[in-house]
Amino acid sequence: GYLHYGMNRIDERVRRILRSDFGYRVGVLASEEIKNTLGTAMPDKAPKDVIMHATGINLAKRMPVNFDVETKPVLDACEDVVGELARLVNTVVDSAPEELSADLTDAGAVLTGGGAAMAELDRRIGQALGIPCRVADAPEGCAIRGLYRIMENPEAYSAMLMDRQSRQVW
């Protein structure tokens, strides 16, 4: 399986909750800021009384307004996606070759991508896998840096590249 749109699904859910439950429309950047400020991958450990000020459109009045966003709806939006992500990562690791599983057990996993910066995501994934887990330095640029390395020396990485015929990584 895969998680379509990755952590951006949380942003979409935040926008949907604010619109349907509270009558506010916010943009993509605002919902991402709300997620980054109030969201966490460990909702049980999150403070419940945090409030963030946001700007959006009051749909009833069709006017721009400042309003407060509470933690709970954001944590709810995070939990569904993070829970699904943890299950998917666990499934991938369970089906990994023995050598990779041994490396993961010894060295742990490294989270990459912009969503890796979510508060406590490394702990949540580490708990789901039962191995150490950390966030890469500058995680949002890892895919581009990796692609650049492959393009510089494709022969060195040919064994790891996906076979177009089989569409299998291993």
Name every feature range the model reports, one short phrase each.
Residues 1-79:
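Phosphate-binding glycine-rich/basic clefts of nucleotide- and phosphate-handling proteins
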Residues 14, 89, 111, 147:
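Residue-level signature of catalytic and energy-coupling elements of molecular machines
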Residues 25-29, 139, 163:
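Interdomain boundary/hinge elements
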Residues 77-105, 150-154:
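Phosphate/ATP-binding catalytic cores across multiple sugar-kinase/actin-like superfamilies
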Residues 1, 111-112, 136:
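Thr-Gly-centered strand-to-loop micro-motif
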Residues 164-170:
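A short, charged, Gly/Pro-tolerant segment at domain boundaries
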Residues 39, 43, 101-125:
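Glycine-rich phosphate-binding loops at beta-strand->alpha-helix junctions
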Residues 123-149, 153, 157, 164:
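Conserved phosphate-binding/catalytic loops in two-lobed NTP-binding clefts
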